[in-house]
Curated annotation (Swiss-Prot):
GO terms for biological process: division septum assembly. Keywords: Cell cycle, Cell division, GTP-binding, Magnesium, Metal-binding, Nucleotide-binding, Septation. Mg(2+) binds at residues 37, 58. This is Probable GTP-binding protein EngB. Signal peptide: none annotated. Necessary for normal cell division and for the maintenance of normal septation. The gene is engB. GTP binds at residues 30-37, 56-60, 74-77, 141-144, 173-175. SUPFAM superfamilies: P-loop containing nucleoside triphosphate hydrolases (SSF52540). Belongs to the TRAFAC class TrmE-Era-EngA-EngB-Septin-like GTPase superfamily. EngB GTPase family. It holds the Pfam family MMR_HSR1.
Length: 190
């Protein structure tokens, strides 16, 4: 399935400021600078989500209408160390409200950097998703920066860690080489 049409339809800075929950939603979550916006732009086949080399650029929840059928939802990155405690609390409130109020949220796509093991904030995100009983998949980003053996080793580490959360699908992805793109699209747009 291809993404033929996409548009940013809503940017939410506060809880409840979302579009009507009438379309299937897929949320994208991950640490700051893990490549959420880059992944979305690769899926969209154009630069619609703003990318930056500075972590913490996405500070709102952005709703993209895809093929007039689905919302792809870009969540703020978590774990950005230089954000103020007040801003971190606001982001936490925004994401918790989103998870707890969106009955049409069918899947969370958690992005993790393939070069590093899971971090404390990744575990917190997994606990949130578990608490809300939301299905999820894991996308390992930046796989082009690892050798084949290094990637294989990291996938094994992630598989072992994720057994505690029901062994979700793990998709190795690279925006540069487009590795994993077709596999991901099959899951996101059934």
């Amino acid at each position: 399935m291809l993404i033929k049409k996409v548009e940013l339809v809503k940017t939410a800075f506060k809880p409840g400021d979302y579009p009507e929950p009438v379309k299937r939603e897929v949320a994208f979550a991950g640490r700051s600078n893990v490549g959420k916006s880059t992944l979305l732009n690769t899926l969209f086949q154009r630069k619609l989500a703003h990318t930056s080399s500075k972590p913490g650029k996405t500070r709102s929840i952005n709703f993209y209408l895809v093929n007039s059928k689905y919302y792809f939802v870009d969540l703020p990155g978590y774990g950005f160390a230089s954000a103020s405690k007040q801003e971190l609390a606001r982001w936490k409130e925004l994401i918790e409200d989103y998870f707890s109020t969106r009955d049409n949220l069918n899947l969370v796509t958690i992005l993790m950097d393939s070069r590093h093991p899971m971090q404390k904030n990744d575990y917190k995100m997994l606990e949130w998703i578990k608490d809300y009983s939301i299905p999820f998949i894991v996308v390992l980003t930046k796989t082009d920066k690892l050798s084949g053996n290094e990637l294989k080793k990291m996938i094994q580490i992630y598989e072992k860690e994720l057994k505690l959360w029901g062994s979700p699908p793990i998709i190795p992805f690279s925006a540069k080489t487009r590795r994993g793109l077709n596999e991901l699209l099959k899951i996101l747009i059934p």
